[in-house]
Amino acid sequence: MLSLLVWILTLSDTFSQGTQTRFSQEPADQTVVAGQRAVLPCVLLNYSGIVQWTKDGLALGMGQGLKAWPRYRVVGSADAGQYNLEITDAELSDDASYECQATEAALRSRRAKLTVLIPPEDTRIDGGPVILLQAGTPHNLTCRAFNAKPAATIIWFRDGTQQEGAVASTELLKDGKRETTVSQLLINPTDLDIGRVFTCRSMNEAIPSGKETSIELDVHHPPTVTLSIEPQTVQEGERVVFTCQATANPEILGYRWAKGGFLIEDAHESRYETNVDYSFFTEPVSCEVHNKVGSTNVSTLVNVHFAPRIVVDPKPTTTDIGSDVTLTCVWVGNPPLTLTWTKKDSNMVLSNSNQLLLKSVTQADAGTYTCRAIVPRIGVAEREVPLYVNGPPIISSEAVQYAVRGDGGKVECFIGSTPPPDRIAWAWKENFLEVGTLERYTVERTNSGSGVLSTLTINNVMEADFQTHYNCTAWNSFGPGTAIIQLEEREVLPVGIIAGATIGASILLIFFFIALVFFLYRRRKGSRKDVTLRKLDIKVETVNREPLTMHSDREDDTASVSTATRVMKAIYSSFKDDVDLKQDLRCDTIDTREEYEMKDPTNGYYNVRAHEDRPSSRAVLYADYRAPGPARFDGRPSSRLSHSSGYAQLNTYSRGPASDYGPEPTPPGPAAPAGTDTTSQLSYENYEKFNSHPFPGAAGYPTYRLGYPQAPPSGLERTPYEAYDPIGKYATATRFSYTSQHSDYGQRFQQRMQTHV
């Protein structure tokens, strides 16, 4: 019975649970992007009453259509217990907590949070789309993303490359739900950022791809300048061109040039040209370019090669014994110079730096030091600096001095050390004297820039003065200094010997100059003589052809005149400077003569009869056939081209007009030997200079030539000069005078040359 009761109770409880109202599906939290559709589910079991939705505790209404909320409605099948809330075009106002209620069953669902996401309304970079900046001035690029829910995240890009280091901040709007994000990116613009594009991208959950905006930079900057030199390395005094290349934004307004800080007035272009000196190595040349933003100044030094120049001159130094001394000497030169310190009259190098350090100096260190700078292949310069070392007096006079017996003598005591002596005293024999006169002795003191000189003057030097030692003692603040000086006698030569030697030397010098002039004259004269023909070994014999009747006593081989002439021209054609061929035309009564004078260029090498005797006259004269007439002396000097070397000699005639009487001609002397030389004279064409000794043409004198008489007159009467031997007497002694037997009176004078190889 009891068990049956338990079964009945259990069954009744199960039945009651099967018919109870409950939520089979409740609304849950949901997120939606603004503008999208959202559905909040609500499903009830075993309920057929009224269902309503609340928003943040506010009832939205009953039924499926919610007239107060046009975008809201309850959807689903009521028979199936579906009371879902649908929200279309979600807005920020829809962002709330929702609850489904079964009022008759007194049931409430759990609250569901609907979150509405809102993308940034706008993304903007302050100052865009083009931002003008100053180069070198830091600037913050600012990007703003407005009214986003949740707050937007901002990313920066520079020409597509993401940038780090931006700083972001958010600002909550008054609705308490949306936020504005501000991001700042710090940049330091340069002229290279001109045209650079910066992009700001903002994003949140509502728009994961994000929104972008970009700006472009326009950077104003002072001119960017490059200064160049051409050539880069020059010698002092050469020309250099400076070129100033510049870029700027905005445009360049002008150029200015300066050297060593001083403006160059006449330079206003981008190019400056000048001659450089050593100062361009130490004083820079600057180019300044300016625009509206500012100016840029660029400087440069020129690599000028120049000789050493002093920068710090060494100064004379005075110090005490035992002290340390530093001498300073600074030079500048290019290429880098070599510096040496030496002591005067010594080649030992003491230092190679700008400073010379001398430790614990003594008086021996006193003197002049030389600071020498050497720039290889450019130049050398030096400076001298004296060093004075204070100490006891040092007497630098000669230990032996000289004087002439009977004359005035001097004994000198010189102190060149520092400081100058306070006292100087002389002592000799029993005498002591500082200054003044004592008997024949006088002491004088003289101060000069190099030291102090004390002089002991002796009047009428005697033998005893040469036997005495002279003591010179000087004192200064450092102590005394002493020197012993010996006076010795100087031998003097008599004035007559000196004068005679001087005169003799002068005479010898004069004779030497005369001999030198004569030697040079003879050498110059000899150099103008013979010209050696350096040709083949050819022997040439010149044969004079004359009328047969005038030389009937001579016989020799003959040759064709035309052949000899051609050979002569062929051999002597290259020596036309040494062959003087002249033709004199002279009309005396009825005859016309041709005369030639020629210098033998072979110097007698081809003279095959040089051993024969020759007349003293070098002019070989030939008689021509002419009508009888009054004789006349025809004087002429020997030719300059007449030499003893065997030159061919041809006759010329004087053209001097007849005038007053003169002395009778002298017969020729005996024939001179072959080696005899006579004075060389010029070739003669006109001999008016012989007018001082003319012979009249109508005075009864026949015409004569030097050395040979004229043919007798037609009357066979001898003239006053017939005492001379016939012309044939000298025919064999005349050089190259070999007359053909076949010649006649009607033929003109010709020469014939025989050549032997």
Swiss-Prot record:
Gene3D superfamilies linked: Immunoglobulins
Cytoplasmic side: 521-757
Motif mapping: Cell attachment site: 405-407
Signal peptide limits: 1-16
Membrane-traversing stretches: 500-520
The UniProt record lists the keyword Transmembrane helix: yes
Pfam families from the UniProt entry: C2-set_2, I-set, Ig_3
One of the GO BP terms on file: renal protein absorption
Cellular component annotations (GO), alphabetically ordered: cell-cell junction; dendritic shaft; perinuclear region of cytoplasm; plasma membrane
Any GO molecular function: myosin binding
Post-translational modification remark: Phosphorylation probably regulates the interaction with NSH2. Phosphorylated at Tyr-605 and Tyr-606 by FYN, leading to GRB2 binding.
Coiled coil: none
Compartments where found: Cell membrane
Chain segments carrying region Disordered: 649-679
Record's keyword terms, sorted: Cell membrane, Disease variant, Disulfide bond, Glycoprotein, Immunoglobulin domain, Membrane, Phosphoprotein, Repeat, Signal, Transmembrane, Transmembrane helix
Domain of life: Eukaryota
Disulfide-bonded cysteines: 42-100, 143-200, 244-287, 329-371, 413-472
Positions of modified residues (Phosphoserine): 574
Tissue: Abundantly expressed in kidney. Specifically expressed in podocytes of kidney glomeruli.
Assembly mode: Interacts with TJP1/ZO-1 and with NPHS2/podocin (via the C-terminus). Interacts with NPHS1/nephrin (via the Ig-like domains); this interaction is dependent on KIRREL1 glycosylation. Homodimer (via the Ig-like domains). Interacts when tyrosine-phosphorylated with GRB2.
Related illness: Nephrotic syndrome 23: A form of nephrotic syndrome, a renal disease clinically characterized by severe proteinuria, resulting in complications such as hypoalbuminemia, hyperlipidemia and edema. Kidney biopsies show non-specific histologic changes such as focal segmental glomerulosclerosis and diffuse mesangial proliferation. Some affected individuals have an inherited steroid-resistant form that progresses to end-stage renal failure. NPHS23 is an autosomal recessive form characterized by onset of proteinuria in the first or second decade of life, and variable outcome.
Function (record text): Required for proper function of the glomerular filtration barrier. It is involved in the maintenance of a stable podocyte architecture with interdigitating foot processes connected by specialized cell-cell junctions, known as the slit diaphragm. It is a signaling protein that needs the presence of TEC kinases to fully trans-activate the transcription factor AP-1.
Protein family per UniProt: Belongs to the immunoglobulin superfamily.
Protein's recorded name: Kin of IRRE-like protein 1
Organism: Homo sapiens
This protein's encoding gene: KIRREL1
